[in-house]
């Protein structure tokens, strides 16, 4: 039986962090919908404070629409768009930014309160401070991403989209891990088995797969090669190579989709092998075994959902579900990696 120090855990702090994690999850999902509806460039200004309010009059709506008309996306893709149609894409981007602001408020105010009341375990204070800083950085990265589509491109740069999503998911993982530590406390000893390394490696692989998925989304690569398991009848797409090494890795539709597929196959095999190993293991605690089985199930569901999404050319509902599934898989992998460290 693990012994915990009472001063080393705080259930109120844990619950607060779990709420933050749910809000980050919602922001990731709405961000996916924003990308799929091509709404991310609808707000062409960055106003962290005043931008929290949407246009409140017809004149304000027209002013925002006129700003949108100045960017390449309107001229080359949405020329002739009506004000009502513009409002449709505006609300997605506004909701995404509003959730970002809400995450900041829900994190910062309780953090100060718990800090003053000395309710945060000492070893977690620095983590919470880092999370607060990363949250602020995420807002800057978000605008950096949007700005890439305001002058020459008709969409945001895929590598900047990958950076924005990657930081959001890193925050998601960090918040969940910290919440679990706040809930359970720190064990006097940590379990040292081969499972620790494997679980962290699997978590890293899931995170990397999410970054590959961002490149697929940023290049609209889910709209091509919509057969499976082949790609237009071939194992390797004919249009694999891009303009140079980075062009292939980050901008070739064929390459980014193939890489995303291959990583999915690797994760699927690794999850099945881990599930069998967990079932046979005598050293793995029962709670960790259960988490491993859930992890296998989530991997299988996400793989099936990914194939379905691809073969139907990424309809909005399935695309959003696939992004939500990626976040759920990451949360499950995080929980498993955290759990196997504890005896």
Curated annotation (Swiss-Prot):
- Pathway(s) the chain acts in: Porphyrin-containing compound metabolism; heme A biosynthesis; heme A from heme O: step 1/1
Please tell me where heme binds in this chain. Answer: 260, 322
- Alphabetized UniProt keyword annotations: Cell membrane, Heme biosynthesis, Iron, Membrane, Metal-binding, Oxidoreductase, Transmembrane, Transmembrane helix
Compartments, as annotated in UniProt: Cell membrane
GO CC terms: plasma membrane
Could you list the residue ranges that cross the membrane? 13-33, 96-116, 130-150, 165-185, 197-217, 258-278, 290-310, 311-331
- Cofactor(s) essential for the protein: heme b
The record's section on Pfam families has: COX15-CtaA (PF02628)
The first-level EC class reads oxidoreductase
Say which domain of life the source belongs to: Bacteria
Can you state which reaction this protein catalyses?
Answer: Fe(II)-heme o + 2 A + H2O = Fe(II)-heme a + 2 AH2
Main subcellular localisation = membrane
Q: What is its EC number?
A: 1.17.99.9
Q: Which InterPro entries match?
A: COX15/CtaA_fam, HemeA_Synthase_type2
Instruction: State the protein's purpose.
Output: Catalyzes the conversion of heme O to heme A by two successive hydroxylations of the methyl group at C8. The first hydroxylation forms heme I, the second hydroxylation results in an unstable dihydroxymethyl group, which spontaneously dehydrates, resulting in the formyl group of heme A.
Per its record, how is this protein called by name? Heme A synthase
């Amino acid at each position: 039986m693990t012994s915990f120090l009472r001063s080393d855990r705080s259930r109120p702090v844990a619950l607060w962090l779990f709420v933050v994690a749910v809000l980050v999850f919602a922001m990731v999902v709405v961000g996916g919908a924003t990308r799929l509806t091509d709404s991310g460039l609808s707000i062409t200004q960055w106003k962290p404070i005043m931008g929290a309010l949407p246009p409140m009059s017809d004149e304000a709506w027209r002013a925002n629409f006129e700003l949108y008309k100045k960017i390449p996306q309107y001229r080359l893709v949405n020329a002739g768009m009506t004000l009502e149609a513009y409002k449709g894409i505006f609300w997605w981007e506004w909701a995404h930014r509003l959730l970002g602001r809400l995450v900041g408020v829900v994190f910062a105010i309780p953090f100060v309160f718990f800090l003053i009341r000395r309710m945060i375990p000492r070893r977690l204070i620095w983590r919470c401070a880092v999370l607060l800083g990363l949250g602020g950085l995420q807002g800057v990265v978000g605008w950096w991403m949007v700005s890439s589509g305001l002058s020459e491109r008709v969409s945001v740069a895929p590598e900047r989209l990958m950076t924005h999503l990657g930081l959001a998911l890193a925050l998601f993982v960090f918040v969940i891990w910290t919440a679990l530590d706040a809930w359970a406390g720190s064990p006097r000893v940590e379990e040292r088995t081969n499972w620790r390394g494997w679980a962290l490696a699997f978590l890293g692989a899931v995170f990397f797969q999410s970054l590959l998925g961002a490149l697929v989304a940023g290049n609209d690569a889910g709209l091509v090669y919509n057969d499976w398991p082949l790609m237009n009848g071939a194992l390797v797409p004919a249009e694999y190579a891009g303009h140079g090494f980075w062009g292939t890795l980050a901008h070739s539709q064929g390459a980014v989709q193939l890489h995303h597929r291959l990583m999915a196959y690797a994760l699927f095999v690794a999850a099945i092998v881990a599930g069998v190993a967990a079932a046979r293991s005598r050293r793995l605690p029962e709670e960790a075994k259960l988490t491993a089985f859930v992890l296998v199930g989530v991997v299988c569901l996400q793989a099936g959902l990914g194939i379905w999404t691809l073969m139907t050319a990424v309809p909005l509902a399935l695309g959003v579900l696939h992004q939500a599934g990626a976040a759920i898989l990451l949360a499950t992998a995080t929980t498993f990696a955290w759990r196997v460290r504890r005896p």
